[in-house]
Structure formats: C-alpha cells, structure tokens
From Swiss-Prot:
<protein>
    <recommendedName>
        <fullName>Gluconeogenesis factor</fullName>
    </recommendedName>
</protein>
<dbReference type="GO" id="GO:0005737">
    <property type="term" value="C:cytoplasm"/>
</dbReference>
<comment type="similarity">
    <text>Belongs to the gluconeogenesis factor family.</text>
</comment>
<dbReference type="InterPro" id="IPR038136">
    <property type="entry name" value="CofD-like_dom_sf"/>
</dbReference>
<dbReference type="Pfam" id="PF01933">
    <property type="entry name" value="CofD"/>
</dbReference>
<dbReference type="GO" id="GO:0043743">
    <property type="term" value="F:LPPG:FO 2-phospho-L-lactate transferase activity"/>
</dbReference>
<dbReference type="InterPro" id="IPR010119">
    <property type="entry name" value="Gluconeogen_factor"/>
</dbReference>
<comment type="function">
    <text>Required for morphogenesis under gluconeogenic growth conditions.</text>
</comment>
<keyword id="KW-0963">Cytoplasm</keyword>
<dbReference type="InterPro" id="IPR002882">
    <property type="entry name" value="CofD"/>
</dbReference>
<dbReference type="GO" id="GO:0008360">
    <property type="term" value="P:regulation of cell shape"/>
</dbReference>
Amino acid sequence: MSKETKPKVVVIGGGTGLPVVLKGLKKKEIHLTAIVTVADDGGSSGKIREQMDVLPPGDIRNVMLALSNVDPRVVDLFQYRFAVDGDLSGHVIGNLILTALSQLNDSYVDAINVLATVLKIRGKVIPATDQPLILNAEMEDGSIVHGESLIPLQGKHINRVFIEPENVKPYPTAVEAVKEADLIVIGPGSLYTSILPNLLLEELAEEITASKAQKVYITNILTQIGETDFFSDADHIKVIHEHVGKSFIDKTLINTTTVPKELLFPEDVAQVEHNAEEMEKLGVEAIYQDFLSTEDGLVRHAADKVADALLAMLPNKNNEKE
C-alpha cells in the first residue's frame, strides 16, 4: 500500500492497556499515532517528575517499547527496575534514559523522537501535553483527593476527576493527529487515571468530538479496585461522556470470553458486566467478541484480535503489513 493511502489511526490512553493494543496495531499498514497521558505521579515516574520537573516518563516508555522493533534484550534492559535499596531504588532504566534525553534536547518531544530512532519504533508517540498534569478527584462524600496515584486508594466512589492546571493546552501535534485521523481509539486502561486525563484537555476533547472519524472505546475486561468497582461496560462510556460534556463514542469493543476464576485476583476484582440495553440507549454500537488473552497468567486484551476488529472499521481493509 502506498504511503499516501495508509489510513491514520490515533490511539489515546496510558497505563498498561494501551501498549497491548499498540503491539497489534504496529503490525498493520497504517499511520499509527499514540497520544499518551502525563498525569502519572507514582513510582519511578513520580520521583523523576518531582525531582526533575519533567513529564513523567513511565507511560511514554511503555508505549515506545510496545512499538519498538529491537532485540527483546534491549526491551528487557529498558524495563529493568533497580532493587529496593540504594539511591536508584525503584527506578526503571528506560525512565532515566528518557529523562536524560529530555535534558540533552530542546523539548520532550525531541527526546522522544531521538529514542524512537534508537528503538526503531513503528508509529509516532506524542505526550498529551508538554507539562505534567495533577489529577484530582472529587469523591462521593465531597472530599478532594490530589494526585493520580492516591485516587484508587480511597475506597470510595469517584464523582468526577479534574486536572490542574485547568486550562493547559495539548501538544499541537496531538491536536493535528486527531484532526487528520481516520479512526480514533480510546483505551483500554484505567478509566479515571489513564483515559480521562487526556480527555480533560479541552482543546483535544473538542477535536475528538468534532472529528468525522469513527471513535471507538475499548472496554476494559476487568473492573479496577478504587476506580470502577461494579461498573458495567455501559457505565464506563457514561463516565467518559459526562466528563467530556457530550456523547461522541460511536462503537465499543467488548470481550465476551469468561476470565478463569483463578486469574481474578485480588478477590474483589471482577469481570466487567454487559449491559446491552443501556448501551443501546447510549447510541453506541457494541462489538461483542472474544478479545481475551491469558498468556503468562495475566488478563489482557488479545492484541491481534483487537487490531483486526479496529482495522475492519476502516474503508480500506487491505491493511496487513507487507
């Protein structure tokens, strides 16, 4: 397929769900762009963010490694986390490298582009904005929690999340990618802490909702403690629409395969329930299919099956990588 005719697919999110989908999509003959959240404030990313006043590198690192085409040993090196003791305690080598590159280059995007060359990534990676976001949550009792990593620990229902600074601008290249997209994919990933921080960037959300491209949400397979306890598939989409202020999701991919009980841990993690009636009321087309992977005993989306389902939504179905 010629370069000019490749469809443009934009995937928006963060956390551990997004890289899985990207591993499937990078095999396709498409222009692939990942727009990644910068609200992480925990672990190695949180330490670097606080000490260096830079974007948290963790989600960006994971996305870049998912799109990479290098020896698996290089990936293992970038994912290596130092042991608990010492000054480097808990830090991930890839986070340190990306942070160092941000100091050596004019911008964080320049640093990403340099690392993209080193890792031979297929696609483009763009942080949602050029400054770290503080994610806050208003809980059901009216209390306010400051910080992405603290929100799921409260054991309370979340009424809403909001960001600081409130009027932060998205990266211009992220907005441009959405404008040019033939397909916009949201998720999978933690609803409140990985998905919504991107959609709370007003200008980016406006471009997404105004786009004529198909907008697809990949529903999580499992609920998440402290975020989506007892949520149905329709509940996820309701929350997204409420935060953005309008209905805009056209379709959603929903796994139908039962997760083996022995993989449902801790005990209060559950499989997301289906609510077809409510989904129909939302006007969202639900695509029910076996999207489950349990490789290595972990519950994930099956990357290739998800990629195939997404690419089937494009007018040109001849998208296999040659």
